[in-house]
Amino acid sequence: LISAIVGTHFAFEHNYVLALFCLMLCGFFDSFDGIVARSKKDRTEEEKKFGIQIDSLVDLISFGVYPAIIAYSMGFKSFPCLIIFIIYILGAVIRLGYFNVMEDMRQQQTTEKRKYYQGLPVTSSCLIFPMIYCLTVCLSVPQAQFVYLIGLLVVGILFVANIKVIKPDFKGVLGLIGFGIILLIILIIKGVVLI
């Protein structure tokens, strides 16, 4: 949550590399909350439910609202852009609400770890949008920021799509973190100034 708040400052300063780095940090920190929660074996039912709810609220801000704020700071302020922001954020809200209901039911039936997600997880935005930005900068795509806006629309729809997405294990999470680091390095090498 703090990373998203700090990143919002960078977005409004038009420092998109640091804003997207903060988005990646949101994903990095989010990848460990489940590990920490599962290490607490003596949690009460209330604590488990609180954890699910607070995690989703933070995810909504960090991965549902914050990427739209970055796009808004890029100058997308027209009515059609507003519609895309609404679709993206509503997709994230619906996805998180659905996840909470399904996760609560799943935890009542089993203690096994979740193996897949229904719909694209909102946390995936922490790599998707930095990747879009990185590719458009590296390939010198004209009007690269429009690609980011289209990405918002597509990802917002995928949040609520009836698809199964495999949940990465610990090695998979480390691989995704490594991928995020590579994205950041590429941006630095291409000469995008961080500050």
Tell me the role of every PLM-derived stretch.
Residues 1, 18-21, 53, 57, ...:
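Alpha-helical transmembrane segments of integral membrane proteins
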Residues 2-53, 84-89, 151:
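Membrane-embedded alpha-helical segments that form the functional core of polytopic membrane enzymes
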Residues 5-11, 63-73, 127-135:
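Membrane-interfacial alpha-helical segments at the cytosolic side of multi-pass membrane proteins
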Residues 107-195:
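C-terminal membrane-associated helical module and adjoining short loops/tails
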Residues 32-48, 98-116:
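Cytosolic, membrane-interface loops and tails of multi-pass inner-membrane proteins
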Residues 11-18, 75-79, 143, 186-193:
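Transmembrane helix interruption/hinge and helix-loop junction motifs
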Residues 39-95:
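Multi-pass membrane catalytic core of lipid/isoprenoid biosynthesis enzymes
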